[in-house]
Amino acid sequence: METSNYNFTDSQKESCAVSLMRDTVEALSLRDNISYEEALLRFTSSKIYSALFDYDTGIWRESPDYLLNLY
């Protein structure tokens, strides 16, 4: 992964993480044929959810497919 010298604020990182989470939860619900709400509950109970909001991991920069593969 290419890194830049730009320093993102925590607010920007959070915005990216929330957007990524929404897209990933939607993909999870389609993949597993479950409701969005059920997918959200499952996802937020996972270790990946915690890692997503640990900005030091850099996962907030990735794609929904990448995150779903980690899940």
Predicted regions and their residues:
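C-terminal alpha-helical interaction appendages
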Residues: 1-71
